Design a protein with these regions (language model features):
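Positively charged n-region of N-terminal signal peptides that target proteins for export
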Residues: 1-4
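Terminal presequence/propeptide segments associated with secretion/organelle targeting
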Residues: 8, 15-655
Length: 655
């Protein structure tokens, strides 16, 4: 009975939060939330947003392997997303002779479209509540003393419904509200995906790392794919005789634009948030995880950047790796900045004081804090290990292939690398590993290596690259750290207490009817807000929109991040007033990249592609006055397609 009451209250409280805060489950929009959205400016009924019986806006929104979001924009399968979401695909398709990252790619005919390996596009067909079944299975596992790994529970439920929906798609079960609700989603998955259009990085990522997470920005961050099916319309692997997909629903593109205060809505697949985390969890991120990750990634970027500036072939090989390092590094630094500036730890402690009053004599919060203190040392050791030997180089696949004797795969992996770069990365990683990780965890090979060469990293490096890369990367094992942590935790894990804490937060909020929505978990969500300005600091007020004139103002021929191709610069000089990017206060996070930004009528006005630095506490703490979503204006996309790429046939198809 307690669980039934809890589930009912969860649904009630899902509509109590502030209008602009929250990533709402697309399938649970009720009349109260609908009314709030209409009060904010929405001109559609909830059924037009999500409806399993007839076409709705959600049918036009897709997940790109649950890493990004895209939108269907033509009846012949065109799908638009961010360029940075397509970056890895464009990188994989590029060669020194055809560098599509630097030069861009424009398929003027369908037979010029490039097949993309490994991409998967997910269309949500149905989502339904399976809470009772999951809970019953959990109780059964508990009663029989079976290992209760949730993935095992999910698989059993997914297998059951796979028989019900045989041949209709893929099923994924997900947890909501910290394991108090479970939903099953049915997806149709398409894997024949082809690249159609992508501007050069000098347009798509104008401003580079300098402008990343900043405002104002001037990025043409978009790319267009086409989805293909078998001739009968069913999903299929790539084949030359496949035909363009005919989607159930496409988004209408409008060129009317928006003004400050206009309603905006984002539908997408936000990845992960942790907004009900304890102060101790935030403190661990702030003091242990983020400083190490930010510094190590910065140092690795410097190593790669040095080589990329010396060799164009290395720049092409390592562009994707550098992009990934840079993005995470800036996020980690930004989180540190925001946690400190907005006093997130103290704010969480205030919440804990309120919870303690509600709990009464419970010692849960004390025990949680003590447990975090107990495991802080070993958790720091794990981060150092992961950031050096696990993530510090790109050699794992190559080394594993050699170890297995698979010389063909090893050769393929070697083609992706430059050993001069990897040697420098390994030098840095080994040095940091031996400096920070205690010898008890080194393992046999690294212990012997260090002893033989007296800690001389360069001497050790020579032996490692003389046939011992696999030994160096696998000598230290995560199991050693985990065993030590288990010993410290003594049967009561930090994670189990953190879950117990979140459950208590949920119960308190439900009892007090306080705002609450489920954390993001890579399932379809809706967030609504408005176009707005940003006042990030005292005496600084920033407008909500940028124009092409700003691209020219930032142009610097001597700075790779701000350079422009001569023909594009000439075009900009003729058109200084084209809208480029705009700001909203929609609540987004990683995974929302590429999400459609819709107006009050559900028309496509832009694509979400970034957030501002001041919003980077958002995964754990929402700062309403500072949270912003940075969007590329669809009018800039259309202008680039028309005046720069001259893709008239494509424009006819989508307009």
């Amino acid at each position: 009975m307690k669980r039934i009451v809890l589930a009912t209250a969860l649904l009630f409280c899902a509509v109590c939060a502030f209008a602009d805060e929250g990533m709402w489950m697309i399938n649970t929009i009720d009349r109260v939330l609908e009314k709030r959205m209409k009060s904010a400016g929405l001109k559609l009924d909830a059924k037009m947003l999500y409806d399993e019986e007839q076409e709705s806006l959600s049918d036009a929104v897709v997940a790109l392997a649950f890493g990004c979001t895209g939108s269907m924009i033509s009846n012949d399968g065109l799908m638009i997303t961010n360029h940075h979401c397509a970056y890895s695909d464009i990188h994989a398709l590029s060669t020194l002779g055809h560098n599509y990252l630097e030069d861009g790619f424009w398929a003027m005919r369908r037979d010029e479209e490039l097949p993309v390996k490994g991409q998967a596009i997910y269309f949500l067909k149905k989502i339904f509540d399976v809470t009772d079944e999951v809970m019953a299975l959990r109780q059964e596992f508990d009663a029989e003393h079976k290992p209760m790994a949730m993935r095992r529970v999910y698989k059993q439920i997914e297998d059951k419904y796979a028989q019900v929906y045989e041949g209709q798609g893929e099923l994924i079960c997900s947890s909501y509200y910290n394991g108090n609700k479970y939903y099953m989603a049915l997806y149709q998955v398409y894997r024949d995906v082809r690249l159609v259009a992508a501007p050069p990085v000098s347009i798509a990522s104008f401003g580079g790392d300098t402008d990343n997470w900043e405002w104002p920005q001037h990025k043409g961050d978009f790319a267009i794919y086409r989805i293909y099916t078998a001739p009968d319309g069913s999903p299929a692997e790539y084949a030359p005789d496949n035909v363009p997909m005919h989607p159930k629903k496409i988004l209408k593109i409008t060129q009317d634009g928006l003004k400050d205060g206009d309603f905006t809505m984002v539908i997408g697949y936000p990845g992960r948030t942790n907004r009900y985390a304890s102060s101790y969890a935030v403190e661990e991120i702030l003091q242990i995880q983020n400083p190490i990750q930010a510094q190590f990634r910065l140092d690795q970027m410097k190593i790669i950047d040095k080589w990329m500036n010396e060799d164009v072939a290395i720049r092409l090989k390592y562009a994707d790796r550098y992009f990934s390092l840079s993005n995470v590094q800036e996020i980690r630094e930004g989180e540190i900045y925001c946690y400190n500036r907005f006093g997130v730890v103290d704010a969480k402690r205030t919440e804990e004081q309120q919870l303690q009053k509600w709990l009464g004599n419970s010692d849960l919060i004390y025990r949680l804090g003590q447990k975090y203190e107990d495991v802080a040392g070993i958790n720091q050791q794990i981060v150092y290990f992961q950031e050096t030997l696990v993530r510090g180089t790109n050699l794992h696949r190559y080394a594993n292939a050699l170890f297995r004797g698979d010389t063909v795969l090893a050769a393929k992996e070697l083609e992706k690398l430059d050993m001069r770069v990897e040697r420098d990365l390994m030098r840095y990683s080994l040095g940091q590993f031996f400096k920070h990780v205690r010898p008890v965890y080194w393992g046999e090979y690294l212990t012997g290596l260090n002893q033989r060469f007296g800690g001389d990293v360069d001497a050790m490096l020579n032996e490692v690259f003389d046939g011992h890369i696999h030994d160096a990367l696998t000598s230290c094992k995560i199991v050693a750290f985990n065993e030590k942590r288990d010993e410290i935790e003594a049967g009561v894990s930090k994670n189990s207490l953190e879950k117990e804490y979140k459950d208590a937060v949920y119960r308190m909020k439900l009892a007090k009817k306080q705002p609450m929505y489920p954390d993001a978990n890579s399932t379809m969500r809706l967030t609504y807000g408005k176009v707005c300005t940003l006042d990030p600091r005292d005496a600084v007020s920033l407008a909500s929109r940028t124009r092409t004139a700003g691209v020219l103002e930032k142009y610097n021929a001597d700075d790779y991040e701000f350079t422009l191709k001569p023909d594009f610069r000439e075009l900009l000089l003729q058109h200084p007033d084209i809208p480029v990017n705009f700001l909203t206060d929609n609540d987004i996070t990683g995974g929302n990249s590429g999400s459609p930004v819709l107006n009050a009528k559900g028309e496509l006005v832009g694509l979400a592609f970034d957030g501002n630095k001041e919003s980077l506490a958002g995964d754990t703490y929402f700062v309403e006055s500072m949270n912003r979503c940075i969007c590329v204006d669809i009018r800039y996309v259309l202008w680039l397609l028309r005046d720069y790429a001259h893709m008239d046939e494509l424009l006819t198809e989508i307009l």
